[in-house]
Each structure stands twice: as structure tokens, then as C-alpha cells.
């Protein structure tokens, strides 16, 4: 199973996935060889190796092919062929998702309420600092933290969100569950027509209704009544055919700020694809009815015809600058900030790999502070100037975590963001994003600073995925930087315990988002361990191996695994953890949403 699989069982399942009867397996094998092998048998960057597909659920594979990022590669396949391919790759029969009615709450309970101690959106609020000032427990309670309950959610993705006594969790299979935060019983479940990757946001409408808001990979945004699960409205945020929403929407003062990116990086593998016409940006919606108020672009210039590629296809540019993470709202300056990704096609412009400021009321681009110029990159090009591939090829050093707006002890505000370069950047919001400092914390790569930093007013805290450039050159660890100067305050190298599932796929990198409370920060690792570190000196105060098997409250087994991507949040005295939220290149999936409290009470 997903949590305690030994190396021998892993090998046996792999043999099953790669062999099987000729009659049942050959069609799927041929499909894989024709459409998938070129990437998954020769993985680079974000591409998961073929063996990493084995622990996934067949339904995850089918969703990726039919609704998700692989839908272009799967074009023309029937549902039966997709199912056969999923069985071939995982070695398991097609599965079904958990029964949404299992362990339904006996009573509806009080409607969700907004207030201190809640956690909304990716960063806990519109400033995206990932800091919980009212955790409901203290540093002295850390040794007593124990699992209170577990919920099995195959395909779990966006981090847990809390409003009042309700916990909201989402699945990449397109389902959102509302659970009783105290017991884990199910209040309601909502299903979309697409895949999801991000957290939900919570906010109040003008009529007093508390709503949850979330986007999907079809670029649709929905508002759902937080008490009942009833759909209130649905809006298609961007008309571009490949547009998608993978970052959390941000709620502020009756409006939603929606990050938009696109799947062009993968689709441009086809030299017949006219790369590229997409510009990333932010869309502002009225939270009451979903009406589009404005749309702002990271790249100011509209794409125009540029060159004809080696296959004879007309190309367009500039393009790219997708926004992969939650926007950050600055009410004082009437701005909303977005962190942008690389360009897809030239000419190079200043809105890629940048922190971009938009007017909060109109969407006008006010300024852009670019960290890396000329970063034009497409998936699987690997420096080959053929087809749509850029020349020269960029390095894919996106800003992919939300910019944090943090106030220092002297009252000065600083914008901080991390990029895949392994660099943490600080910008001055009062000087059009002027660079204040930059600190290299790792060698950079696909897992570095992607998912989110945290700040407590004095320091910025960042987990390390690639080899550290501050401490020992080993993967994993946590670094604290002074908010106003970027000076390294401390670095704690990542421990390297054995993984609960054995040696295969056992890694100790720490790409997941970190979360801070007064006196401690939480950071998880790909080995399944969740640790609390002292904010003062980086000492490890608490360590829990989450990669176990749990009797879930919804009547099935839950399996822990990697801690990656969205990881943990703290609200109302409970530490909520996604164990097994592995991303594309994580080796070990699970499906456990854990509620951890003092003494498990």
C-alpha cells in the first residue's frame, strides 16, 4: 500500500505494471510508448519518472489525461484507453473515490464563522505571510502533539483551510470536502468538472453568507456556500484555451484576485503548435456574483507574429509570465502583487520572473521588478533550438511562491519572494519594487522556494530542497534570514532518517511550504517527517513521522507519505497536515489529512 510498502513489494508491483497479459497490456503499452515514454522514460526537471507513477491512483492518471495537464498528449484517446493506460502504469484496477456520505455529520452544526485563529487561502490571509499569531497552543506544548483523527482523501492537493469549526480540503480529482474540524465528520462534498491543485479561500458576502472560493485547471472559479456546499456562482476567468488556475485565489474586501497561468509550456512540445499567445496575469472578480471587474497582465505587450519555426509553424510573442501562486493584497498602497514565471517565447520582456504590482481598483500594471531577464523556457527543449524551442534556452527560474507583504519591527514594510533559483528576494513596495536584498540559500532547482516562505516580522523562514549554499551542501534544511537585511540568522541542516516505506524513493529534501507560529516554524520533508524548529536558533523542537497507516474517520485506511507542496497550517489549536501530497517529481504519495492536537484531544 502507499505508506508501508517495502522495496520488494515496490519491485513486484513495478513488474506487474510493466508486464501483464499480452492481450490486456499491449494496447496500453503501445499508447505509453507512442505518447508518454519520450518524457517519463527520460525524465528531466518537473517530469516524474515512470516508477514514480506507480504509487499513484489509477483515477489520478485518468484525471490527468482527461482533464489535467496531460490532456493534450491524450487527445483522441477513449475513456477505456485512458483507463487501460492508468491500470498499466499503476498495476492496480481502476479505483473509486471515497464515498462522500461516509461519516456524514449527524447534525449540520454552526455555520462557519470568520475571525481570529482561522486560515484562509494559501498564506493564511491576503498578505500571504504564512504566520499564525493565534495558534491555540504554544512552543511548550509541542512534545505533546498527537494525531487526533485522520481523513483519507486520495489525490489530496491544496492545503487545509479553516473557518470557525469547519475544515476545507481539496483533491486534485476535483472534489472539495467540508469537514467538522473537531471530529473529521463530513459536512458536505462538492465536485467540479476539472482537476484542482490549490487551496480554497474563505470570505463573507454582502448578505452575510460565508463562501468558499476556488479555481481549477479549466480556469473556472466557483463560489460555494461554506455551510451547505451549494454552488453560488461559476465564472470562466480567462478565455485563452490553455488557461488554468493552479494558485489559490485571494479574497479581500468583497473581491477575489485570481492568478492565471497556462499549459503552453507542455503543448509547445508539438512543433505544429503556434507558440505562444498567452500572457499571465491576475483577474479581479466580484465575490458576490463572480462578475469580472478587471484583468491585468504581467506582460504589457500583446503577442504578435514573430518567426517561423523549423517545422514551418508561425510563432508569436512575447508570451508567458504565468502566475502560479496566490496574489498578495496591499490595502495601504491600493496594489495587488503577483509573482510571475518564465517566458514561453520571445522577445524578452520585463514581466517574466518578476514581482508585478497591479492597481487594486483598475488592474493597471503599476510596476514590475524583474529578478531574471531572458528566461525564455519550454518543457523538454533541453537546449535544442528546434521546433518551438527558444534560442538561447532559459533556466526556468520562476517565481512560484506568493510574494509576502511583511511589516518589520520598525514599521517598514517589505515584499519577500522566493524563486526556483534558490534565491530569496526582498523588494521595497514604496519604491516601485526596488531590490532591497537577495540571498542565495540553495543551488536552485525545481523544488526550491516553490511553495511558500513564512515570516514573523523579524525573520523570513525558508525550507531548502536542493543542496544548501549556507550550511552543509546536502538536500533539506531550514534557513532564517533577517527581514530587513537578508542576513543569515541560522541554518539547520535536514536530518536523514530512514523512510517508513524503505529505501526506494526515500529522499530528505524539504520543498513544502513552511508555516510559522510564535516561537516555532513547521517544515515537512519528502521522508514524511514533519518538524518544528525554534525561530530563535533553528533547534528542532519536535519531530513526527507522518508516513504511517491510519484508521480514517471516513471508514477506510489513510496512508501517509511525502510532505510536499501544500503541507500544514495551524488554526484554533490544531495542526492540520497533508501527508502524501506529493507533487509531480515526489517519489511517495499518500492520502492522509491529519488533525494533530495537544495530547490528541
Describe every region a protein language model picked out.
Residues 133-154, 310, 389, 495, ...:
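A short helix->beta-strand "capping" segment at the edge of beta-propeller domains
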Residues 38, 47-93, 255, 335:
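Extracytoplasmic electron-transfer domains, predominantly the class I c-type cytochrome c fold
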Residues 116-123, 154-175, 193-221, 244-274, ...:
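Repeat-blade elements of multi-bladed beta-propeller folds
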Residues 236-239, 293-317, 365-394, 440-443, ...:
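Surface-exposed loop and turn segments in beta-propeller and other repeat-based domains
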Residues 146-148, 185-188, 230-234, 293-294, ...:
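A structural motif specific to WD40 beta-propellers
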Residues 103-148, 298, 302-303:
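Blade/loop signatures of beta-propeller domains
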Residues 225, 277-291, 351-364, 475-486, ...:
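Beta-propeller blade signature
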Residues 25-42:
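Sequence/structural segment immediately N-terminal to covalent heme-attachment motifs in c-type
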Amino acid at each position: 500500500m502507499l505508506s508501508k510498502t517495502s522495496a520488494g513489494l515496490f519491485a513486484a508491483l513495478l513488474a506487474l505494471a510493466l508486464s501483464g497479459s499480452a492481450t490486456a497490456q499491449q494496447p496500453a503499452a503501445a499508447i505509453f510508448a507512442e505518447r508518454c515514454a519520450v518524457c517519463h522514460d527520460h525524465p528531466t526537471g518537473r517530469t516524474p519518472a515512470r516508477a514514480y507513477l506507480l504509487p499513484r491512483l489509477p483515477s489520478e492518471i485518468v484525471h490527468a489525461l482527461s482533464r489535467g495537464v496531460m490532456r493534450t498528449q491524450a487527445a483522441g484517446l477513449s475513456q477505456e484507453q485512458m483507463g487501460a493506460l492508468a491500470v498499466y502504469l499503476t498495476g492496480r484496477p481502476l479505483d473509486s473515490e471515497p464515498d462522500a456520505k461516509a461519516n456524514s455529520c449527524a447534525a449540520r452544526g454552526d455555520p462557519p464563522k470568520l475571525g481570529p485563529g482561522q486560515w484562509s487561502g494559501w498564506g493564511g490571509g491576503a498578505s500571504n505571510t504564512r504566520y499564525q499569531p493565534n495558534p491555540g497552543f504554544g512552543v511548550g506544548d509541542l512534545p505533546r502533539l498527537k494525531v487526533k483523527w485522520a481523513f483519507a482523501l486520495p489525490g489530496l492537493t491544496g492545503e487545509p483551510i479553516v473557518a470557525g469549526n469547519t475544515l476545507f480540503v481539496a483533491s486534485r480529482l476535483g472534489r472539495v470536502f467540508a469537514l467538522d474540524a473537531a471530529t473529521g465528520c463530513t459536512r458536505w462534498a462538492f465536485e467540479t468538472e476539472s482537476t484542482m491543485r490549490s487551496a480554497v479561500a474563505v470570505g463573507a458576502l454582502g448578505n452575510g453568507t460565508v463562501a468558499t472560493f476556488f479555481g481549477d485547471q479549466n480556469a473556472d472559479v466557483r463560489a460555494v456556500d461554506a455551510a451547505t456546499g451549494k454552488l453560488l456562482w461559476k465564472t470562466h476567468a480567462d478565455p485563452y484555451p490553455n488557461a488554468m488556475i493552479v494558485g489559490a485565489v485571494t479574497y479581500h474586501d468583497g473581491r477575489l484576485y485570481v492568478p492565471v497561468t497556462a499549459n503552453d509550456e507542455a503543448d509547445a512540445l508539438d512543433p505544429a503548435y503556434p507558440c505562444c499567445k498567452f500572457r499571465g496575469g491576475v483577474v479581479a472578480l466580484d465575490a458576490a456574483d463572480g462578475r469580472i471587474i478587471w484583468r491585468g497582465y504581467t506582460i504589457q505587450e500583446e503577442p504578435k507574429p514573430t518567426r517561423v519555426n523549423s517545422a514551418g509553424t508561425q510563432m508569436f510573442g512575447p508570451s508567458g509570465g504565468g502566475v502560479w501562486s496566490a496574489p498578495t493584497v496591499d490595502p495601504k498602497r491600493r496594489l495587488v502583487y503577483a509573482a510571475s514565471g518564465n517566458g514561453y517565447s520571445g522577445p524578452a520582456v520585463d514581466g517574466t520572473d518578476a514581482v508585478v504590482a497591479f492597481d487594486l481598483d483598475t488592474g493597471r500594471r503599476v510596476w514590475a521588478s524583474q529578478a531574471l531577464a531572458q528566461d525564455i523556457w519550454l518543457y523538454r527543449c533541453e537546449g535544442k533550438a528546434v521546433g518551438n524551442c527558444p534560442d538561447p534556452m532559459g533556466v526556468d527560474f520562476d517565481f512560484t511562491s506568493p510574494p509576502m507583504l511583511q511589516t518589520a519591527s520598525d514599521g517598514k514594510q517589505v515584499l519577500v519572494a522566493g524563486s526556483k533559483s534558490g534565491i530569496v528576494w526582498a523588494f521595497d513596495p514604496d519604491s516601485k519594487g526596488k531590490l532591497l536584498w537577495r540571498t542565495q540559500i540553495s543551488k536552485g532547482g525545481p523544488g526550491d522556494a516553490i511553495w511558500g516562505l513564512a515570516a514573523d516580522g523579524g525573520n523570513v523562514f525558508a525550507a531548502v530542497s536542493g543542496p544548501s549554499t549556507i550550511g552543509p551542501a546536502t538536500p533539506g534544511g531550514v534557513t532564517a534570514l533577517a527581514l530587513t537585511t537578508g542576513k543569515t540568522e541560522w541554518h539547520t541542516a535536514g536530518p536523514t532518517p530512514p523512510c517508513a516505506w524503505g529505501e526506494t524513493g526515500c529522499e530528505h529534501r524539504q520543498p513544502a511550504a513552511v508555516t510559522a507560529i510564535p516561537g516555532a516554524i513547521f517544515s515537512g520533508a519528502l521522508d514524511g517527517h514533519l518538524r518544528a524548529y525554534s525561530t530563535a536558533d533553528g533547534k528542532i523542537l519536535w519531530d513526527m513521522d507522518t508516513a504511517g497507516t491510519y484508521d480514517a474517520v471516513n471508514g477506510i485506511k489513510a496512508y501517509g507519505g511525502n510532505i510536499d507542496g501544500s503541507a500544514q497550517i495551524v488554526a484554533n489549536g490544531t495542526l492540520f497536515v497533508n501527508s502524501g501530497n506529493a507533487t509531480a517529481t515526489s517519489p511517495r504519495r499518500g492520502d492522509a489529512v491529519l488533525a494533530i492536537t495537544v495530547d490528541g484531544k
